[in-house]
Structures are given as structure tokens and as C-alpha cells.
């Protein structure tokens, strides 16, 4: 059921946009049919996570990202520019390019959710926002990404990876132009199986910029602050602890 204006339109456009990176890209659940407020997808057979499937997925994800996007925060093709959604939280999708990744991440992926934090937590996050916006933390996309932004899933926590007998199939995207490292970092927020093997195979297929392992926490902050906005609780302490490392 569609709980948000345009949520199904956004999901359908995102699935089709990600699937357009096939056959080299990652597996994406098929859209069988959809209408106003509803979406039909096939029932996926369940397999077991394996090292081999993880490595295959890592290589394929590199090619999905390499399919690219026009700019950071770009909406998927076919979606009239509007806010998207990550879970039940709104997701700003700017229609114009932003000058740097740090400015984009600060303005559109951290700041919109800071009103959920207490004053002390907001103070730390404000320092991080300033540092991000300065460009001091900017870094390159992986080698295969030659567009201004990667074509990202946008919500790649463990539950959105379906391990089928034919390999990993992605569901429930918050698809957008983003930094590839954010998808890779999100794998570890809730412990996706073989996350290290996924990242290692990805790095072999499309070498990541130096220091990428140190930046995993930085790229998890968007997903974590969204969880602060939605749920509060222990997510705040985790978010602030990571942010302190970067201010």
C-alpha cells in the first residue's frame, strides 16, 4: 500500500532505472504491474548467502553504479522531480547539480534530519555539516564511475538484499544519483552477510578511492540519521560517535 504521495511511482521508476544497468549490473526485482498506490512483484525463491554469490553481487553492483546519473541527488529516469523516500522518511532529490559531494551530503542527506536530535547532538552534527560543505572530506567515485554520480540503490541495508538460488536480487530502493561508497557502507549498518566479500569483489572490479575503508562510517551517517529521525533511541549515540571522528 502507498503510504506517501508518489511513493509507488518513485519505487517503480527506481527499480526500472536500476534494472537498465543489466545484464552486467546487479539483479533487480521485476515490476510485474503497478497502479496508483500499489505494486506487484514476483515472489522470489529463497536461497542461502554464499561467498560466491556475494562476490558476484559485488562485481555486478560495480556495473550498476557505473551506469551513472546526471548529478548527485538525481531522481531516477521517469520520476517527475519531487522528494523521494527512504523507508518512511522523505528524501530530498535536488533537480540541479550541487558543486561537491560534501555540500550535497551535508545539505540534503544530513541537515534535513537534524531536527530529531537534542542540542548536544545537533552541535556535533553542525560541525560535521560545516566540514563536509567546505569540501575537506570530498573523495573520488570508484574507477568505473565516470558520470557525475553513481547510479545507487540508496537503501542497501541487509533486508533489501534477497539471496535467491540465482544470486542476490535487490528490492525496495531509494534510487538516486549518489556516491557509490554509500551503498557499500550501508551493507554493514545491519550486518549483511558477506559484506566484506561484497566490498572486496567490488574493489577488484572497480577500484575504490584510497581510504575507502576509513570512510565506511562517514557514508553510513545518512542511513543512521534517518533512523534517528524515524526512531530516535540508540541510533543517536551511534550517529554522534561516528560524526565525532570527522569534526
Regions inferred by a protein language model and the residue ranges of each:
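Short, solvent-exposed loop/turn segments at secondary-structure junctions
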Residues: 2-3, 34-38, 45-47, 110, ...
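ATP/Mg2+ or Mg2+-diphosphate-binding catalytic cores
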Residues: 227-247
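Hydrophobic alpha-helical segments that form the core
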Residues: 217-225
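An alpha-helical support segment within catalytic cores of ATP-dependent transferases
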Residues: 69-152
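ATP-binding pocket architecture of kinase catalytic cores
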Residues: 1-103
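Alpha-helical elements of Rossmann-like donor-binding domains used by nucleotide-donor carbohydrate transfer enzymes
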Residues: 10-17, 56-63, 127, 131, ...
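Active-site Asp-x-Gly
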Residues: 94-106, 145-151, 158-214, 230-233
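Short strand-connecting beta-turns/loops that link adjacent beta-strands
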Residues: 36, 165-167, 221
Amino acid at each position: 500500500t502507498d503510504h506517501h504521495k508518489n511513493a509507488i511511482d518513485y519505487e517503480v521508476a527506481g527499480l526500472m532505472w536500476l534494472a537498465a544497468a543489466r545484464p552486467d549490473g546487479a539483479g533487480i526485482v521485476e515490476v510485474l504491474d503497478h497502479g496508483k498506490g500499489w505494486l506487484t512483484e514476483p515472489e522470489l525463491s529463497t536461497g542461502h548467502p554464499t561467498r560466491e554469490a556475494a562476490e558476484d553481487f559485488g562485481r555486478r553492483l560495480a556495473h550498476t553504479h557505473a551506469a551513472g546519473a546526471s548529478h548527485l541527488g538525481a531522481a531516477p529516469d521517469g520520476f517527475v522531480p519531487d522528494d523521494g523516500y527512504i523507508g518512511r522518511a522523505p528524501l530530498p532529490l535536488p533537480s540541479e547539480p550541487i558543486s561537491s559531494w560534501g555540500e550535497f551530503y551535508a545539505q540534503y542527506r544530513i541537515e534535513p534530519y537534524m531536527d530529531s536530535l537534542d542540542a548536544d547532538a545537533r552541535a556535533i552534527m553542525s560541525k560535521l555539516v560545516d566540514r563536509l560543505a567546505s569540501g575537506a572530506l570530498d573523495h573520488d567515485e570508484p574507477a568505473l564511475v565516470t558520470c557525475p554520480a553513481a547510479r545507487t540503490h540508496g537503501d542497501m541495508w541487509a533486508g533489501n538484499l534477497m539471496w535467491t538460488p540465482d544470486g542476490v536480487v535487490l528490492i525496495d530502493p531509494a534510487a538516486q544519483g549518489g556516491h557509490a561508497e554509500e551503498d557499500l557502507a550501508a551493507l554493514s549498518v545491519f550486518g549483511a552477510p558477506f559484506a566484506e566479500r561484497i566490498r572486496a569483489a567490488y574493489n577488484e572490479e572497480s577500484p575504490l578511492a584510497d581510504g575507502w575503508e576509513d570512510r565506511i562510517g562517514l557514508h553510513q551517517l545518512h542511513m543512521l540519521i534517518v533512523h534517528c529521525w524515524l526512531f530516535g533511541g540508540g541510533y543517536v549515540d551511534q550517529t554522534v560517535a561516528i560524526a565525532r571522528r570527522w569534526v
